[in-house]
Amino acid sequence: MTAAENVCYTLINVPMDSEPPSEISLKNDLEKGDVKSKTEALKKVIIMILNGEKLPGLLMTIIRFVLPLQDHTIKKLLLVFWEIVPKTTPDGRLLHEMILVCDAYRKDLQHPNEFIRGSTLRFLCKLKEAELLEPLMPAIRACLEHRHSYVRRNAVLAIYTIYRNFEHLIPDAPELIHDFLVDEKDASCKRNAFMMLIHADQDRALDYLSTCIDQVQTFGDILQLVIVELIYKACHANPSERARFIRCIYNLLQSSSPAVKYEAAGTLVTLSSAPTAIKAAAQCYIDLIIKESDNNVKLIVLDRLIELKEHPAHERVLQDLVMDILRVLSTPDLEVRKKTLQLALDLVSSRNVEELVIVLKKEVIKTNNVSEHEDTDKYRQLLVRTLHSCSVRFPDMAANVIPVLMEFLSDNNEAAAADVLEFVREAIQRFDNLRMLIVEKMLEVFHAIKSVKIYRGALWILGEYCSTKEDIQSVMTEIRRSLGEIPIVESEIKKEAGELKPEEEITVGPVQKLVTEMGTYATQSALSSSRPTKKEEDRPPLRGFLLDGDFFVAASLATTLTKIALRYVALVQEKKKQNSFVAEAMLLMATILHLGKSSLPKKPITDDDVDRISLCLKVLSECSPLMNDIFNKECRQSLSHMLSAKLEEEKLSQKKESEKRNVTVQPDDPISFMQLTAKNEMNCKEDQFQLSLLAAMGNTQRKEAADPLASKLNKVTQLTGFSDPVYAEAYVHVNQYDIVLDVLVVNQTSDTLQNCTLELATLGDLKLVEKPSPLTLAPHDFANIKANVKVASTENGIIFGNIVYDVSGAASDRNCVVLSDIHIDIMDYIQPATCTDAEFRQMWAEFEWENKVTVNTNMIDLNDYLRHILKSTNMKCLTPEKALSGYCGFMAANLYARSIFGEDALANVSIEKPIHQGPDAAVTGHIRIRAKSQGMALSLGDKINLSQKKTSI
């Protein structure tokens, strides 16, 4: 018998503050009390029997005085009582009193009330005594013809259970149920009958389905789901049946029930690899995503589409459905949009890239018309990155994309503008034919850029790629326009002197006294000192940045001016024009230096920026060929090398992914003789319905699922010692959002232990769902207790507690055995993830909790230590492999991971190997961990410290 078929008893809480009733008082209430008293007494009897009391003297009393009553509440309680009361003698023979009970069952099966009949039939499903069931078989059969569907469907369940447990009692059950199914009209009755045939006589079920295969679409959804399950199981066991039933699955794709459509699509994919079948299933998935309102459903179905894409043969079919997949972008949820865009990007080809770009451009324009929202900004970023990737993969599309995206350089959202700038920088370097277009568009939006970071990037691009005399002059004009009147210091002093004009004076409104909640006076003024003055609003952008004290942009400007001046000198032969242009560039640098040294800016210029601007002045004053090469050639080559390395890294990553996806089994993989299949082939060989059932019951583990030979015994935690009167050990089963403790409790004494209770408490972000119920342990007996602990976040948690019990017949106080602590491993909740460098830096700046861990290890190789940290923390290294290759005595790497609760974890590894200590010197350094929550940062730090201790031993 499987775990799913075991009897599940209802646990009833007993108030401990009242005295347990005596058998005599209960007998008196059951014999002489009214209906209410008998009801209460029967409840107490049930609770006492559940807690281990025998009460044999009350059995005949209940049969004589309670069983004949017609009260519905008492009848329901009696069903519970007959389920739990011992029905056999110690030697296993049926009690004589149960013959009387059997007669009562028969009368209830013929009762005019359909609820009593149905409840009795449900109760009979739980009986394990064939002697009790045998006299009832005619009455159970008769219930199949009852007028009410509630009775009929429970009669089917009773017949199925009896046939499964005691086939000799009703050997013709499959034939009986088949005849019932043919004439039945009620959907729930047909569903139960069909389900029985699936498990009892699958051939008969298939024959019935063949007779009504054209009417399947008219059936109710509960019956359609069972039909899908039958077809899946039949074809899984016997592939030759596929041709017989695949048309039925196609028809069920048109069902009105989303659940049926989803299951039918999943079954169709397993039955056939034909392009038409894959296309029909994918189209069904897409329709479900669009029509379903629940975002969780959308994400689940999207995952099924992504699984389809992983198969090389299916990927080609899905490429034709890219435009249909993009319809999902109408969903406002960001996570759904993110997955959809990634899927579309993976499927895009030269055949449909043009249509994809048109749709994405429309989506980008739509984000302009939507009111500003955090998700809108993030969605715009996703669109920009997708268009960026499309343009890199399909260069012909870049010319269509650039004009639309360039407008976002002036966007208030700096993150989206930064993504556009990154795309423009890559496009202008890769595509020579687009340089003129990009420079032209850049000059158009240059004056409207609001962010200093974007302004710096735009300056660099213009300085690097303006190659004609006209473009260089246009750049100089834009810079002068953005800088305003020069010299800056003199013009600003003049403005300050004439600043307070009547129309610009700030007027102060009348002062009003207010009384606060504490009874004190508060003064309210109409003066708004934070309002920017008209003078500040009218400042040109570059001038505003400089007066705010941001002189890093000035250093970038000096480099740009130097580049275009050197290029202008090379292009123009007239000495006068050369000198004039160079002098103008030097004047701009000098006036910025003057401003930086004055008291006008909010923050003074830094020494680094002064050095950079001074260096540029010196380069322009000398104009040496060496400096010309450095500024106009080496800079561009550096960018080219960086982009090439990035592209190579992406190709390598894609190659690894494709190899991992395409190779089902390696030649040197070990064979698991238990299954005779490769480990990574097992998923497709398993019955998916059985797998989902096991997952729902919590019988599969994420780590063990990959290897069927892995044992649960590896995770057993001993809670008490072998010399303790009660021995306990637990298997910690970690699910996604909860932990199940399966505790084995063994009574090692010769006494009966009563009220043996497992008392648990938690430390950290853990919560005990329910308190385990007390139990009674016979001498040297054992029992399993399960406890559920809910997990709310990724934080090191501790479960501790004790076992308390009473010794039968002893007058002493309760005994207590203290349990060892159970430490919950956070690695079960952390998964490697990836993000861009910009996102990493942004999160690093935003996260407020930092944990600095000092490296303490015996390891002598930097790369080995990094690999050890990655394995210990389950994080992903974002630093490219090429950047970590070679040996120079020190290493810096960025790590990233996400928890299943959506928490981000960042780490920066900064390590070195002291050369002066010789080749056997241990690795030293620090690991800085940053997270949004304190628990995450501390937990990861503890994990690293623990792993370092293990390596140091």
Swiss-Prot record:
Pfam families: Adaptin_N, Coatamer_beta_C, Coatomer_b_Cpla. The lineage of its organism: Eukaryota, Metazoa, Chordata, Craniata, Vertebrata. The modification N6-acetyllysine is found at K494. It is a peripheral membrane protein. This is Coatomer subunit beta. It is found in: Cytoplasm; Golgi apparatus membrane; Cytoplasmic vesicle, COPI-coated vesicle membrane; Cell membrane. GO terms for molecular function: structural molecule activity. The gene is COPB1. The modification N-acetylthreonine is found at T2. HEAT repeats lie at residues 96-131, 132-168, 240-276, 277-314, 316-353, 396-433. One of its GO terms (cellular component) is endoplasmic reticulum-Golgi intermediate compartment. Oligomeric complex that consists of at least the alpha, beta, beta', gamma, delta, epsilon and zeta subunits. Interacts (via C-terminus) with HIV-1 Nef; the interaction is direct. Interacts with CAPN8 and PRKCE. Interacts with SCYL1. Interacts with COPG1. Interacts with ARF1 (myristoylated); this interaction is required for binding of COPB1 to Golgi membranes. Interacts (via trunk domain) with ARF1 (via switch I region); the interaction is direct. One of its GO terms (biological process) is endoplasmic reticulum to Golgi vesicle-mediated transport. Brefeldin A induces dissociation from the Golgi of the beta-COP and presumably the other coatomer subunits. It comes from Pongo abelii. The coatomer is a cytosolic protein complex that binds to dilysine motifs and reversibly associates with Golgi non-clathrin-coated vesicles, which further mediate biosynthetic protein transport from the ER, via the Golgi up to the trans Golgi network. Coatomer complex is required for budding from Golgi membranes, and is essential for the retrograde Golgi-to-ER transport of dilysine-tagged proteins. Gene3D superfamilies: Leucine-rich Repeat Variant (1.25.10.10). Keywords: Acetylation, Cell membrane, Cytoplasm, Cytoplasmic vesicle, ER-Golgi transport, Golgi apparatus, Membrane, Protein transport, Repeat, Transport. InterPro entries: ARM-like (IPR011989), ARM-type_fold (IPR016024), Clathrin/coatomer_adapt-like_N (IPR002553), Coatomer_bsu_C (IPR011710), COPB1 (IPR016460), COPB1_appendage_platform_dom (IPR029446).
